[in-house]
């Protein structure tokens, strides 16, 4: 990548003279600027688009939000997700600010690309159309995540100056939704996006992902006809199917499997997360800040289809995890369950109070609930539990459930 550098030549008269004037309104020499970046780099568009994907979603947001519900608990009393869960949060809480800042940074990146893509030289028209489609869907998803959490939010499709960003007003939620749906309709109806990608481009927004996001928006608004129509199209034309193993669905060996419609992109060494450090037991190097709650465990039904409290249930308190929905074993680490290491070794965990290294109450790094998380365990992790495993944002099971709800 080359950057044009303009030399400033000061005349000898100015240097020698007692008074001189230096033009401070010049481009910096040590980095590219917006003045030249788009025109000089033929890959400027795809590089900018890749940056937009960084803000699509992340693993810690995916998992920590469970602590706002009856599914999980975070043992740090000053944690913002705990505050949201008990209703004591404020806009100054770190998690709230992180979601707000992250989503609006993603929106700004999309707006930067959309405003400047015409300046990129020799960009293939079909690629340009696709990049615009990807950016508009990414922006739509960011707005969806904002208005579903905050209601009325500032809406803009331009890059704001600092002054403008300090004075922009909130836009009515209904207007935000209408604008987001208009963008999605443009992309979907205009065939901006392919239905699939080659191996080098897996993880990018497809036509089906755009439609799935549109279905989620309509589901949130209770427009059942639209939800049914969109999800039915995905079901009949998308070529997706449920993955054969629920546990395997969330393993790095099975990324981009038949059920994944949209996931946030991570990659070993280049973009990783360290969420396993947050939810694993001490035996595997974790400190279990985030732990499943009993309410989540109790919600898994028996193999006979009955709940554990239903009359005639086969639930046995002396063997509480036997004959349960297999998703329980794949999601929650309980006493007798195990993590499989890369070499095939099974590490069996004992969560019982006062027992071993991982038992409830044994140490500050142990679970606060007597359970650990198993879902999204990545046995290919690097040192200190760094992982490149992608969190799934939308999968085919979501489409089936939305379709059923809309009937």
PLM features per residue range, with description:
Residues 1-30:
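Bacterial Sec-dependent N-terminal signal peptides
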Residues 20-64, 300-311, 318-319:
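Membrane-proximal, proline-rich intrinsically disordered regions
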Residues 4, 18-20, 119-136, 221-236, ...:
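Secondary-structure transition into beta-strands, especially the periplasmic turns and strand N-termini
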Residues 155, 159-255:
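Hydrophobic, small-residue-rich alpha-helical packing segments that form membrane-like cores
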Residues 22-25, 60-62, 73-77, 146-155, ...:
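Proline-centered turn/helix-capping motifs that create local helix->coil transitions or kinks
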